[in-house]
Amino acid sequence: MNITGKGAYDTGTYANLFQRSGYREDEIKARLEQTWNDLFYGDEHTRIYYPVGDDKGYMLDTGNDDVRSEGMSYGMMMAVQMDKKHEFDRLWNYAYTYMQHTEGRYKDYFAWHCKPDGTRLSPGPAPDGEEFFAMALFFASNRWGDGPAPYDYQAQARKILHACLHQGEQGEGDPMWEPSNRLIKFIPELPFSDPSYHLPHFYELFAQYANEQDRTFWKEAAEASRAYLRTACHPVTGLSPEYANYDGTPAPVQLHGDFRHFYSDAYRVAANVALDWEWFRKDPWQVQQSNRIQAFFSDIDVSDYRRYTIEGEPFNEPALHPVGLLATNAMASLAADGPDADSFVKRFWNTPLRQGKRRYYDNCLYFFTMLALSGNYRVY
């Protein structure tokens, strides 16, 4: 692993770890295309994308039978990375039409989940959706150019990010980033964070693409999030809690559950850290962190993945999304230079998409890892 020098953003060269592990370019390309086809147009046990009418579509959270801003924005990122404008525009039109608020305390934010018919189930937003929507829209603008509203991608992305930083300044509502420390919040109203929401590699790009007045903020947010992740990830195990205070310590138990431990949301941290390293190579800690989390899981079979304390103590409770956890552990190989990096790439390659009721979250993470390890999760 190249732990010196520049990231892919500067070099234009993205590591193809599948190829490095001995797989042929033609089989890698075929596998990526097949994975897209299975997720978007496969059988009812595998697919998570559903077109609606002439111009909309949604990503279904199959475990909860709803549509989430997380999944919609993930689907858009998948589509722009794969150069699939048709599906991208359908997803965006659905989110824009049914999920994005046009007034009130959540203006320009997205309701975090709704029914497949577009009926909102909760008005409040989940900020990981907004940041993925904005990044996917900027990439779409740069890949395909802008069209008439709502397909004026750049303007739509800037509108979202403006709300994220300035909501409440002229009226009701709260920003999604805490102005005093530049950290993303779990939800706008609460003073703590979710480590898996921290995407410094996105904020580096927001610092170039967002409204000019906010570019310094985004640059500072990238640095703040990198520093935050160093406090939120355990120094021995590499595990992080689902929710954490601004100092990185696990957040208190919430009315809706105990999120102090390493569980579903937290899996994404390993993937985010590794992609930030691949794109920008700004924090050598990310290499050691990736080695740590791979070392922790190196001798644990996927069938035995559990919920863990961040110190590494397993609960009896099995992981709800074991394939998703394997995927993010494998994506850590983008940054890892330890003895487990290659074996995780191969374990992932030999693991199929998840089928059945709980497949949505696993397979979203799976697809991002398929993109990343084939050198196709790129900056546009």
Swiss-Prot record:
Enzyme class: hydrolase
Keywords: Carbohydrate metabolism, Glycosidase, Hydrolase, Polysaccharide degradation, Xylan degradation
Lineage top rank: taxon: Bacteria
Name of one Pfam family that matches: Glyco_hydro_8
GO molecular-function terms, A-Z: oligosaccharide reducing-end xylanase activity
InterPro entries assigned: 6-hairpin_glycosidase_sf, 6hp_glycosidase-like_sf, Glyco_hydro_8
Active site: E70, D265
Function: Involved in depolymerization of xylan, a major component of the lignocellulosic substrates. Acts as an exo-oligoxylanase that efficiently hydrolyzes xylooligosaccharides, releasing xylose from their reducing ends. Hydrolyzes xylooligomers of 3 to 6 xylose units to xylose and xylobiose. Besides linear xylooligosaccharides, also hydrolyzes branched xylooligomers, such as xylooligomers decorated with 4-O-methyl-D-glucuronic acid moieties. Its proposed role is the degradation of xylooligomers produced by the activity of extracellular xylanases once they have been transported inside cells.
Name this polypeptide is given: Reducing-end xylose-releasing exo-oligoxylanase Rex8A
UniProt source species: Paenibacillus barcinonensis
Gene coding for it: rex8A
